[in-house]
Amino acid sequence: MTIPATGRIVRNGSGQDIVIERTFRAPIADVWESIVDPERMNRWVGTWSGDAGTGKRVSFTMTAEEGATPEEVLIHGCDAPKRLDVESFQGETSWRMKLDLSESDGITTLVFSQNVEVSDEGASSYGPGWEYYLDRLVATHEGTSFASWDDYYPAQVPFWEEELRKAGTRESS
């Protein structure tokens, strides 16, 4: 089974972002805890340790992937329960990610964004990766099982390649 991609590439002042939205039939505070509490994060993506706070660094490990190594994450901003702004470092590479939450009538919307470098050859795999992890987050809230990674990758790569092309970061193949 292939899971359709739902995200998009949006140009910004410094390049472009992967943007993916998810909705939850849950209060904003509950969804917020799922993205900041190490134990609850571990259910869908990974866990972190350290002294968290704006301007501080924590160690984050993705637990849904075999052999994942801890990476350093700088917390640029945290406005609970509405916004988390972090930067993840792997060697000389870094990714800025933002999670914005809003609630209306008991429905919480999460908007995830991650910067994507024009020259990054792996950019078309980041979209499927975040679609996968954000769907895992939704599944933890709904009490449903997780789809397989194979339902996202490589099936979604053409969609994300086209998004990158439309944003002016890729030539037509």
Predicted feature descriptions by range:
Residues I28-A29, H76-P81, L101-T109:
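A short, structured loop/turn motif at beta-sheet edges
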Residues M1-W48, S173:
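Hydrophobic ligand-binding cavity/cleft-lining segments
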Residues M1-R11, I107-S173:
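Terminal "cap-and-tail" regions of soluble proteins that handle hydrophobic small molecules
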Residues V19, A68-E72, T93-K98, S125:
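Short, surface-exposed coil-to-beta transition loops
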Residues I3-P4, P70, L74, S104-D105:
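Charge-dense, helix-prone N-terminal extensions
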Residues V31, M41, V58, I75, ...:
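Hydrophobic pocket/interface hotspot
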Residues M62, S88, F112-Q114:
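Residue-level recognition of conserved beta-strand positions in structured domain cores
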